[in-house]
UniProtKB/Swiss-Prot annotation:
Designated name of the protein: 4-substituted benzoates-glutamate ligase GH3.12
Pfam families for this protein: GH3, GH3_C, GH3_M
Origin species: Arabidopsis thaliana
InterPro entries in alphabetical order: GH3, GH3_C, GH3_M
Stated regulation of activity: Specifically and reversibly inhibited by salicylic acid (SA).
Residues engaged in binding salicylate: 120-123
Binding site for AMP: 95-96, 301, 324, 328, 347, 398, 417
Stated consequence of mutating residue 502 to K: In pbs3-1; loss of conjugating activity, and impaired resistance to virulent and avirulent pathogens
Keywords: Coiled coil, Hypersensitive response, Ligase, Plant defense
Assembly and binders: Interacts with the P.syringae pv. maculicola effector HopW1-1 (via C-terminus).
Length: 575
């Protein structure tokens, strides 16, 4: 197949070619994927020994991860890749394991990294077009690598970001502004994420005048970095003043590389940073510490949207740029309007990434799956992916809304995860519904001088009737360093939160709750400060990645519930 992307062509022409020829690119891509795979054990049950798009769509079933897991497990345990893929499977990508339960292992090969590198180069061009002067400095990016595991077959299993950072693609990346970071590679590759995060902050502070952008993959990680800064700035200043890294950082790569960045004692710089951090309010702290920062690059769509107010507070309303929509299955596309408001972010799907189909979610026949070029404006769909690593017509589990078109390429807004729900009876509360309800509670908290830091939930069926439990971590409005137990909780406000949350839920919930009596009163359990950091630490200990971590909005793990329950300081009901 002729390459879709010619690095020597202009950016505008590259983008126009991709987005104007969606159908032909998708058809050619599907043929390229399927033709060598018709003899695999999986596909030969459905296809004759040649490519035929109509037969593919008619015979090959739409599947979930559980449907193909037996085939993947065979490769994991040592059988040949051609059980499911004619192209050699060189490893497995781990999902975050926080949205829908246990981690999934997706097959991958270098085609995934080819696509990822393509997207990185494309989004660099997009940002260059929209953000002036961004080429004149470095990025303070909170990027992490997680220790990989090995499958019985000897293939690595790791998260997508680790696969990229440990690859030759990253090692031999272009020497331009977008790949220029304040942190040495050794900090990114450090397997101890606590040490890595501290070193990211230290290197960024030393080079504070060179930073033109900062960020992380997800907004939650950016917020955590700021929280670590709040708790560690005195130690960081001490390191800068002395020119020596703290002894508790034991990773040799970090020790050696960060020492070079420190470059000896810098007492005047330490004094400047200390004066900034010592001020009463941390509003705008990012812009004050890194005055040349032009934008924050991090995902703020979906469940990450709740962190937008906190980032706006700390970053003094710098643009929050959500660049890319991707998953362990594939990279979907990029945001071509990077300076738009977080609530307006849409991603233009790139037709050369994978073969995309869509299950309609607005009623009608869900078997009437449509191609990328046939989606309709204003309709919602679940994407289905066929990729180069052995996934054929696999449901992704996301729900997306068509918001427009760039030439012929559809643009999608991420709406929610399909499989994250609370349910006691006939009620089905998805992540979007829960987020809207919590947003109403957040307004009540703010009127009482409290900020919502994070939340999660679970359906408690140990009582009769069962009821929704929502865990909230709150803080004082100005972010003062106090334990939750040390400032007075407004009992009336929190009881009101229970009521407004119930009022925000749908009619099925209200019928079950107030008419049928099949759901009990909604409960809020307030947890002490630092609880959601502990929850993150738990999931990381179970295999989740620091860089890709998202707070689960519905807890399914009994052990994770124990982490939360040990931190509860108060309970409120909607009675």
């Amino acid at each position: 197949m002729k390459p879709i992307f010619d690095i020597n062509e202009t950016f505008e022409k590259q983008l126009k070619d991709l987005t104007s020829n969606v159908k032909s690119i998708q058809d050619n891509l599907l043929e390229e994927i399927i033709t060598p795979n018709t003899k695999t054990e999986y596909l030969q049950r459905f296809l004759i020994d040649r490519f035929d798009k109509e037969l593919f769509k008619k015979n090959v079933p739409i599947v979930s991860y559980e449907d193909i897991k037996p085939y993947l497990d065979r490769v994991v345990n040592g059988e040949s890749s051609d059980v499911i893929s004619a192209r050699t499977i060189t490893g497995f990508l781990l999902s975050s394991g926080t949205s829908g339960g246990a981690q999934k292992m997706m097959p991958w090969n270098n085609k995934y990294l080819d696509n990822l590198t393509f997207i990185y180069d494309l989004r660099m061009q997009v940002i260059t077009k929209h953000v002036k002067g961004v080429e004149e400095g470095k990025g303070m990016m909170f990027l992490f690598t997680k220790q990989e595991s090995m499958t019985p077959s000897g293939l690595p299993a790791r998260v997508a970001t680790s696969s990229y950072f440990k690859s030759d693609y990253f090692k031999n990346r272009p020497s331009n502004w977008y790949y220029s970071y304040t942190s040495p590679d050794e900090v990114i590759l450090c397997p101890n994420n606590t040490e890595s995060l501290y070193c990211h902050l230290l290197c960024g502070l030393v080079q504070r005048d060179e930073v033109v952008r900062t960020g992380s993959i997800f907004a939650s990680v950016m917020v955590r970095a700021i929280e670590v800064l709040k708790n560690s700035w005195e130690e960081l200043c001490s390191n800068i003043r002395s020119g020596h890294l703290s002894n508790w950082v034991t990773d040799l790569g970090c020790q050696n590389s960060v020492s070079l960045v420190l470059g000896g004692p810098r007492p005047e710089l330490a004094d400047t940073i200390e004066e900034i951090c010592n001020q009463n309010s941390w509003k705008g702290i990012v812009k004050r510490l890194w005055p040349n920062t032009k934008y924050i690059e991090t995902v703020v769509t979906g469940s990450m949207g709740q962190y937008v107010p906190m980032l706006n507070y700390y970053c003094n309303d710098l643009p929050l740029v959500s660049t890319t929509y991707g998953s362990s299955e594939t990279t979907f596309g990029i945001n071509l309007d990077p300076l738009c408001k977080p609530e307006d972010v849409s991603y233009t799907f790139m037709p050369n990434m994978s073969y995309f189909e869509f299950i309609p979610m607005d009623g009608g026949d869900k078997n009437d799956v449509v191609d990328l070029e046939d989606v309709k404006l204003g309709c919602t769909y679940e994407p289905v992916v066929t990729n180069f690593a052995g996934l054929y017509r696999m449901r992704v589990g996301d729900i997306v809304l068509v918001t427009g078109f760039y030439n012929n390429a559809p643009q999608f807004k991420f709406v929610r995860r399909e499989n994250v729900v609370l349910s006691i009876d006939s009620d089905k509360t998805n992540e979007e519904d829960l987020f809207k309800a919590v947003s109403q509670a957040k307004l009540v908290l703010e009127s009482s001088g409290l900020d919502l830091k994070d939340f999660t939930s679970y359906a408690d069926t140990s009582t009769f009737p069962g009821h929704y439990v929502v865990y909230l971590e709150v803080d004082t409005k100005e972010g003062e360093e106090k334990e939750t137990a040390q400032f007075e909780l407004d009992e009336e406000a929190l009881s009101t939160c229970c009521l407004v949350m119930e009022e925000s839920l749908d009619n099925v919930y209200k019928r079950c709750r107030f008419k049928d009596g099949s759901i009990g009163p909604l409960e809020i359990r307030v947890v002490r400060q630092g609880t959601f950091d502990s929850l993150m630490d738990f999931f990381i200990s179970q295999g989740a990645s620091t860089g890709q971590y998202k707070t689960p909005r519905c807890i399914k793990s009994g052990k994770a519930l124990q982490v939360l329950e040990t931190c509860v300081v108060a309970k409120f009901f909607s009675i």
